[in-house]
Amino acid sequence: MNLAPSGALAPLPSLTTPPPQPSVAALPPIVAPQGAVVPGQAVLSLTARYGKDLPVISSGLVWRVFADRPDEAGTFKLVREDRGATPNIVLPPGGYVVHVAFGTVSAVRAVTLKSETDRESFLLPAGGLRIEGRVGSSKIPQNQISFGIYKGSQFEIGERASLLPNVAAGDVALLPEGTYYIVSNYGDANSVVRSDIRVQAGKLTDVTVTHRAAVITLKLVGDRGGEALANTAWSVITPGGDVIKESIGAFPRVILAEGEYRAIAKNEGKVFERPFNVVNGVDGEIEVIAR
């Protein structure tokens, strides 16, 4: 696994999850002129930084301003929403609750506005994590690999739910600064890799997860090099008898971690099998002879 932290986060690619959505009775958004001063109104000027001495966050923010008291239904009414980096929101004087979200990182603060400009700066110690997978020197296609992100280290005791269960390769996950571990699944069989990583505030960390596996195509044939027989039920098992993958078809493809296996084919009430080895990065066909 390669960790390659780069500099401060620039405007980021697509996020892997939408920002947290507070339970609100949403109103149509009202766009306030930037910096406009309206008689009898107040201006709420908002900014967010990665940390006390770190840069201003320039994109990816979602600001929501709520009433500071619930309505008759017990809901805190959404007053304004803005997706700008440094919005100036014009509001009547009074009390409000400001919520800002940046990926999975968020903060909330109560404010009291008077007939003047109130400048509020939030600290969101977040960093970006971008992951890709490789077999040998080859990049694994995005549609063949997925990543789950968990809080803490893989070596800590106890079960934990995933923070982000299905991150696509190349997407940027925005996370609070801290330690995480990645569970990488190449295919849907047994090629699984776990890696601990560290996310730093204001930085984009690129991680490459290396799998030792190959893509194997299974064929049941009457003779070597012959046509594959349709309607074949397949099982791939380990030498110890553990079932790794089951499928039905003439040409099933399975991604397997390197190692020793046995292919079992069932067709028209008959069972055929053969042992085979998977070598890292060497894709191939395994023919089982129907004899």
For each of these PLM feature ranges, what is it?
Residues D82-V97, A101-T104, N166-Y181, Y186-A189, ...:
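Short Pro-Gly-centered beta-turn/loop motif in secreted/extracellular proteins
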Residues L44-L46, G60-F66, Y96-V98, L124, ...:
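Short, structured motif recognition centered on aromatic/hydrophobic residues
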Residues M1-Q41:
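Compositionally biased, proline/threonine/alanine/serine-rich low-complexity intrinsically disordered stretches
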Residues K52-D71, S137-I157, D223-D242:
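Short, ordered, surface-exposed loop/turn motifs in non-cytosolic proteins
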Residues V192, G240-N267, V271-G281:
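C-terminal soluble interaction/assembly domains
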Residues P20-V31, D82-R83, F102-P125, G187-T210, ...:
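Structured interaction patches on ligand/partner-binding surfaces of diverse proteins
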Residues A67-A85, Q154-A169, T238-A250:
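Short, acidic Ser/Thr/Gly-rich low-complexity loop/linker segments typical of extracellular
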Residues A42-P55, L129-S137, V215-R224:
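A short, amphipathic beta-strand motif
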